[in-house]
Amino acid sequence: MTLYDRALKLMFLLPPERIHGIISGALQTLHLATPVNRVMEKAVRVHDPVLRQTVFGVDFPAPLGLAAGFDKNAEAIDSWGAIGFGYAEMGTVTPKSQPGNPTPRLFRLPEDKAILNRMGFNNKGALVVADNLRARRSRDVVGINIGKNKTSEDAVADYRATSTLLGQLADYLVVNVSSPNTPGLRDLQAVEELRPILEVVKKSTTTPVLVKIAPDLSDEDIDAVADLAVELELAGIVATNTTISRSGLKTPASKVEKMGAGGISGAPLENRSLEVLKRLHERVGDKLVLVSVGGISTPEQAWERITAGASLLQGYTPFIYGGLGWIRGIHRGIAAQIKAHGLDSIEQAVGSGLEWKAL
């Protein structure tokens, strides 16, 4: 058992949202301590040129990034690169601040190495996030995940407002229409609803725009979103968000039922997230950048996503269960596979179908 595993057992004695607050507070302190940041970055981050790539015009030093949902307000923005991530996605950010859903709204499923959440886009609003983005000192790659306010009746206007304000301050934007925790949001994944949103975001910014989809979409709907993304010349697709499915869980059904509604993230998404990635890659090839997220717990799983067509990876729940060692392990594992296959860079591995080599 590692030191982090021991710490995790102690942390799990506290409510999940309390732990999130403690970790966020520590990272915000690191964010403010520039000298410590630099020492951490040198000691923890995997600096290997084979991991570097240029994706939609942005230079990524490494492929694994923090998924949206952890740093909703970009309050620890300068700390994510220091602890090893190649980039970080802030948000989800809405035009106006909102409290999200009532607590408790965050639950652990340790038997599944998963989390169930129904946070509901709790955030301080686009203006606060814009100020935090302007104040950042690092030049690490930062994406912004944007959504609509819960009470808004004009989704297009919400996405326009946030993309106009934040687009110029980010390296890329992600249109989130796939969270299960805002009533009616997932309905916006239907092409007739999604088209005007993506069109207005594209017109509002010159920053690369991606769309994030749910794992629960039918294959036909996945194809339709992919085709629309190609037609509108989006930069890419992030696949996938949390799932509303409860199948295949090790946690007793009665316990999960008591937790209530919400999306599940972590290990249970592994198979479906990979299926969606493969379908997208078959559909769009290299016309779009694919960002894979959901159930990437090991270096071997990360390599499988890269060779199945993902240029970039993301994680949130595995970071909670694995800590800094998870980030470092993923990057070291990918770098070792690139070299073992005689490749010069990660770009040559993307979509290659190369299998994992035991080293």
Curated annotation (Swiss-Prot):
Q: How is the cofactor bound?
A: Binds 1 FMN per subunit.
- Please name the top-level EC class of this enzyme: oxidoreductase
Q: Which amino acid positions bind FMN, per UniProt?
A: 68-72, 92, 145, 176, 212, 240, 266, 295, 316-317
Tell me which cofactor or cofactors this protein depends on. Answer: FMN
Q: Name one GO biological process term.
A: 'de novo' UMP biosynthetic process
What reactions does this protein catalyze?
(S)-dihydroorotate + a quinone = orotate + a quinol
Q: How does it assemble?
A: Monomer.
> What is the protein name for this chain?
Dihydroorotate dehydrogenase (quinone)
This chain's source organism reads: Corynebacterium striatum
